[in-house]
Amino acid sequence: MVPPVQVSPLIKLGRYSALFLGVAYGATRYNYLKPRAEEERRIAAEEKKKQDELKRIARELAEAQDDSILK
């Protein structure tokens, strides 16, 4: 097995700095996008509710026409 290679402290500092900056960026980006995604989900749920209501009404109208006395 090959022994571990000594890495310069400057390179280690650069790597950990990049890691920390990436984590910080991800956290801020997540906090920025989370409210937008919640709003999109809320709007999608409202649209789905409207579509379901329209489908229900159309189905009831179709059933009412099928059950008509004047067949």
From Swiss-Prot:
Residues modified as Phosphoserine: 68
UniProt entry keywords in alphabetical sequence: Acetylation, ATP synthesis, CF(0), Hydrogen ion transport, Ion transport, Membrane, Mitochondrion, Mitochondrion inner membrane, Phosphoprotein, Transport
Modified-residue entries (N6-acetyllysine), positions: 34
Name of one Pfam family that matches: ATP-synt_E
Location in the cell: Mitochondrion; Mitochondrion inner membrane
GO cellular component: mitochondrial inner membrane; proton-transporting ATP synthase complex
Matching InterPro entries: ATP_synth_F0_esu_mt
GO molecular function: proton-transporting ATP synthase activity, rotational mechanism
Biological process per Gene Ontology, one example term: proton motive force-driven mitochondrial ATP synthesis
Membership in a protein family: Belongs to the ATPase e subunit family.
Record's subunit section: Component of the ATP synthase complex composed at least of ATP5F1A/subunit alpha, ATP5F1B/subunit beta, ATP5MC1/subunit c (homooctomer), MT-ATP6/subunit a, MT-ATP8/subunit 8, ATP5ME/subunit e, ATP5MF/subunit f, ATP5MG/subunit g, ATP5MK/subunit k, ATP5MJ/subunit j, ATP5F1C/subunit gamma, ATP5F1D/subunit delta, ATP5F1E/subunit epsilon, ATP5PF/subunit F6, ATP5PB/subunit b, ATP5PD/subunit d, ATP5PO/subunit OSCP.
Function summary: Subunit e, of the mitochondrial membrane ATP synthase complex (F(1)F(0) ATP synthase or Complex V) that produces ATP from ADP in the presence of a proton gradient across the membrane which is generated by electron transport complexes of the respiratory chain. ATP synthase complex consist of a soluble F(1) head domain - the catalytic core - and a membrane F(1) domain - the membrane proton channel. These two domains are linked by a central stalk rotating inside the F(1) region and a stationary peripheral stalk.
The protein, known as: ATP synthase F(0) complex subunit e, mitochondrial
Species of the source: Pongo abelii (Sumatran orangutan)
Recorded name of the encoding gene: ATP5ME
